[in-house]
Design a protein with these regions (language model features):
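Blade/loop signatures of beta-propeller domains
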Residues: 31-52
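Beta-strand-rich domains and repeat architectures in extracellular enzymes and scaffolds
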Residues: 52-83
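Surface-exposed loop and turn segments in beta-propeller and other repeat-based domains
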Residues: 52-61, 147-160, 164, 198-209, ...
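Conserved beta-propeller blade signature
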Residues: 77-79, 121-123, 177-178, 227-229, ...
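N-terminal secretory signal peptides and thylakoid transit peptides that target proteins
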Residues: 1-18
Length: 347
């Protein structure tokens, strides 16, 4: 379950990767008339083709930056959060914009999908909402109807509002709600399903059981015992905890600032802020690198114009989701907005 990425393993996979790059479309520009070249990334059974212009919007349309997450519902619709009053974009699998939801929450940073009592639910982290509603968890239906809100608990002992700067949310097997204070003190807070505070665990640091930006949370069901997976971004690693908050292990190290994780069977795809996405097997060994950007100056560079980023690479992979067909969706941290669909292919 535990692995450390060494230089030899990294170079081996990187050397096997296939990558063809070209200029990237800007969100909002119309699709070009000439056919796009076939652009691929990854290796072996994890080879992907970049879907040209996926999610492109009508000319002149601006939806704002992408500093958030991606999710799908049972019907296969794709939800992409933005940094604007447009809220969350809803696409079909082919990249056609169907509608937008959650307009009152212009900065949704995380989206966790769940089915509860026959209903499809999103647990979201909102960093900016109405003038009086910032940094809160909002549970909503997939049409944006709000069901529940959680704000900073009094038990946290915060002295100023700025200490509560949450980044991610998931629910545990018993319905408990876990919220990561990733941009704050890196603690992870546990609430019951009604939203009552129960406990917190971890604190800022680099040792076992500590985090330096608990940026992303996921429920890892690849093993006999489900575990809480934490993207410990500024420690460049993924860590496991049980749902009582007990540290289990650091499972993968030397990633490039992991932001979010999504699962497909025994495999996990990790978005990395330093220009890459990585696929890990059940032993948490990398089996493919996707969109690996060789230009370090573009890593974690929010201010880039999408036209400056080669189509088949990422600049700051932030949101990611892998669907039932193992297709992958990635949103870069980008001030204009950049979404990429990678379609799994065969070689």
């Amino acid at each position: 379950m535990h692995t450390t990425l060494n230089r030899r393993s990294l170079l081996g996979i990187a050397g096997a990767s296939m990558l063809v790059a070209a200029a990237a479309p800007v969100m909002g520009e119309p699709a070009g008339e000439s056919p796009a070249p076939r652009l691929v990334t990854g290796n072996g059974e994890w080879t992907y083709e970049i879907v040209p212009e996926w999610g492109a919007l009508p000319a002149g349309t601006q939806f704002g930056g992408t500093h958030g997450a991606i999710a799908t519902d049972k019907a296969g619709r794709v939800y992409v959060s933005t940094q604007s009053e447009t809220g969350v974009l809803v696409y079909d699998a082919n990249g056609k914009l169907l509608k937008t939801i959650a307009h009152e929450y212009p900065e949704v940073h995380a989206i966790f999908y769940a089915e509860e009592g026959g209903d499809e639910i999103f647990y979201t982290v909102v960093q900016k909402g109405t003038p009086k509603e910032n940094w809160l968890m909002v549970k909503m239906k997939t049409d944006g109807t709000v069901l529940q809100k959680i704000t900073a608990p009094g038990e946290a002992g915060f002295k100023t509002p700025n200490e509560w700067r949450i980044t991610s949310v998931v629910t545990g097997p018993d319905g408990s709600i876990f919220i990561a204070n990733g941009y704050g003190d890196s603690r992870i807070f546990r609430f019951d399903k009604q939203g009552n505070y129960k406990a917190s665990f971890t604190h800022k640091g680099s040792g076992d059981g500590e985090c330096n930006c608990s940026h992303g949370l996921a429920v890892d069901t690849r093993y006999d015992q489900p575990l809480l997976l934490v993207c410990d971004r500024e420690n460049y690693r993924l860590s496991h905890y049980d749902f009582d908050g007990k540290f289990v292990a650091n499972i993968t190290q030397h990633l490039r600032r992991p932001c979010q994780v999504s699962f497909h069977g025994d495999y996990a795809v990790v978005s990395e802020l330093q220009g890459r996405a990585t696929i890990l097997d059940k032993d948490n060994v990398p089996v493919a690198f996707l969109g690996d950007n060789p230009q370090r100056s573009q890593w974690a560079n929010y201010g880039l114009k999408p036209s400056e980023i080669p189509t088949a690479v990422f600049s700051a992979a932030h949101g990611c989701f892998i669907d039932s067909l193992a297709n992958i969706y990635v949103s870069d941290w980008n001030q204009t907005g950049r979404i990429t669909k990678l379609k799994r292919t065969t070689v």
